[in-house]
């Protein structure tokens, strides 16, 4: 039997700051899914972190069947955006064409949401109808 432990919170520590900050106000949740969004490496330079998307779910119930809160935050944790309050899974994150995009499941539908990669301001959201296979 394999047991996978999921993180419950993220601690942000910044050089020169005396106090650290937690992403969440408590440890009563798990981060069932996460995805780092990075800028492509150029000329041998390391990839630069743009943001992280995490799906935060209650510790009660099965993480696979419970919906949760989808958050997007910058590397310092100072800018935190609530993307959705009833997300199920993060399917894809990407940075292309000047947009940071997240494809996730909400209410048994796929949702594609675009953000500005600098400010994390929402630029648009589109629900995608997925037909049942025959």
Give residue spans per PLM region:
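Short beta-strand elements that form the blades of beta-propeller/WD-repeat-like
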Residues: 1-12, 47-64, 97-105
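Surface-exposed loop/turn elements that mediate protein-protein interactions on large endomembrane-trafficking
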Residues: 5-34, 65-86, 111-130
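Conserved beta-propeller blade repeats
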Residues: 28-49, 86-103, 129-134
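Short secondary-structure capping micro-motifs at structural edges
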Residues: 37-46, 53-61, 67-69, 82
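Mature extracytoplasmic/lumenal regions of exported proteins
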Residues: 57-58, 68-76, 94, 104
């Amino acid at each position: 039997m394999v047991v996978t432990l999921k993180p419950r919170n993220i601690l942000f520590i910044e050089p020169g700051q005396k106090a650290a900050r937690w992403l969440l106000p408590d440890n009563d949740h798990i981060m069932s899914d996460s995805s780092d969004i990075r800028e492509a490496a150029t000329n041998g330079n390391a990839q630069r972190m743009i943001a992280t998307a995490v799906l935060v779910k209650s510790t009660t119930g099965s993480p696979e069947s419970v919906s949760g809160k989808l958050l997007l935050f910058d590397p310092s944790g100072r800018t935190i955006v609530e993307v959705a309050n009833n997300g199920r899974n993060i399917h894809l994150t990407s940075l292309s064409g000047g947009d940071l995009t997240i494809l996730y499941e909400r209410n048994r539908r796929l949702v594609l949401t675009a953000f500005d990669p600098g400010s994390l301001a929402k630029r648009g959201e589109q629900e995608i109808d997925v037909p049942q296979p025959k």
